[in-house]
């Protein structure tokens, strides 16, 4: 077992678990410093590292001034071989966590907590790209978080986290996508009245879409690219890759392709046998699904016999929309 690095720097979204991560690292013997502006990290580390076996530092990134200091810090930690960890979680999970703890959001809540969450995610996207490690805490309890952190600080190889994101071009392109596919040329279920109110998660809609040869060919090309690119991303020790698929609204075509990819890549998530992708951790995010459903509801009215989408905004993600559900 390799020696734990003396320093771990942590950034992340509000509600993603930075405080909990610090607590878990303290139990692993780390001395912690919380809410430190990036410009103060280097002098603090140089002053403290001779007196402390290991340091865990979480950053204060609320102000643009502090975020502008990250490139200098990122270059330094890379030169020192120090892990720079970004903690994140799906937006519905952050919404539930912050609501349950009645915790104010640093980006304000005048326009709503959901908007504050999305504003912070956008603001921290450049910071996220500077990090060396990423950890989605959406489905982790305290013990699992500690295990992940322990694996990181002990240098245990981690799986490549492949985040599959569906989105709607009408709502904007995900700013953190490494690979992006435009599938607006595929048959549009919106123009099929019996499919319009469904989503790409519904078997009936998937059956309609994948009956089309162009859809099948497009899907196979994307799947083949993932399998072909994966060894090269692993070779450069990239721990996180975001693949985004977009259609017009992010409710039908892109969602269906992401769901099928997650299903077909699932066998590769567990190390076994001769699997081509033995250490791939697949995560799914339907970024604009809920936005699109709300728009359809406003245009055509709620589906008879069902509660309005606006009343389901917390329930829907838990029923299978694993990420910032919007269109």
Swiss-Prot record:
ATP binds at residues 12-19. It comes from the Bacteria. The keyword ATP-binding applies. Keywords: ATP-binding, GTP-binding, Nucleotide-binding. GO terms for molecular function: ATP binding; GTP binding. It holds the Pfam family PapZ_C. Belongs to the RapZ-like family. Displays ATPase and GTPase activities. This is Nucleotide-binding protein CYB_0992. The lineage of its organism: Bacteria, Bacillati, Cyanobacteriota, Cyanophyceae, Synechococcales.
């Amino acid at each position: 077992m390799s020696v734990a690095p003396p320093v771990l720097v942590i950034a992340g979204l509000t509600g993603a678990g930075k405080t909990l991560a610090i607590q878990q690292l303290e139990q692993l013997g780390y001395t912690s410093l919380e809410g430190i502006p990036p410009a103060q990290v280097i002098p603090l580390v140089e002053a403290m590292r001779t007196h402390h076996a290991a340091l865990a530092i979480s950053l204060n990134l609320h102000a643009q001034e502090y975020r502008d200091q990250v490139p200098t810090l990122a270059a330094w930690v890379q030169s020192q071989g120090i892990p720079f960890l970004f903690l994140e979680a799906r937006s519905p999970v952050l919404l539930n966590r912050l609501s349950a703890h009645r915790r104010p959001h640093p980006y304000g809540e005048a326009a709503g907590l959901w908007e504050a969450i999305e504003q912070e995610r956008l603001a921290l996207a450049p910071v996220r790209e500077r990090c060396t490690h990423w950890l989605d805490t959406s489905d982790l309890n305290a013990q699992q978080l500690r295990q992940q952190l322990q694996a990181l600080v002990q240098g245990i190889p981690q799986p490549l986290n492949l985040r599959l994101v569906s989105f709607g071009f009408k709502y904007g392109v995900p700013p953190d996508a490494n690979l992006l596919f435009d599938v607006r040329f595929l048959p549009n279920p919106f123009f099929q009245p019996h499919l319009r109110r469904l989503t790409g998660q519904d078997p009936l809609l998937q059956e309609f879409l994948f009956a089309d040869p162009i859809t099948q060919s497009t899907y196979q090309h994307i799947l083949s690219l993932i399998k072909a690119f994966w060894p090269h991303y692993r070779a450069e020790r990239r721990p996180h890759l975001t693949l985004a698929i977009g259609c017009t609204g992010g409710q039908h075509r892109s969602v269906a392709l992401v769901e099928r990819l997650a299903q077909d890549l699932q066998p590769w998530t567990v190390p076994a046998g001769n699997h081509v992708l033995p250490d791939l951790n697949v995560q799914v995010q339907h970024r604009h699904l809920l936005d699109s459903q709300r728009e359809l509801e406003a245009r055509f009215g709620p589906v008879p016999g069902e509660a309005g989408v606006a009343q389901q905004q917390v329930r829907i993600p838990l029923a299978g929309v694993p990420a910032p559900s919007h269109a």
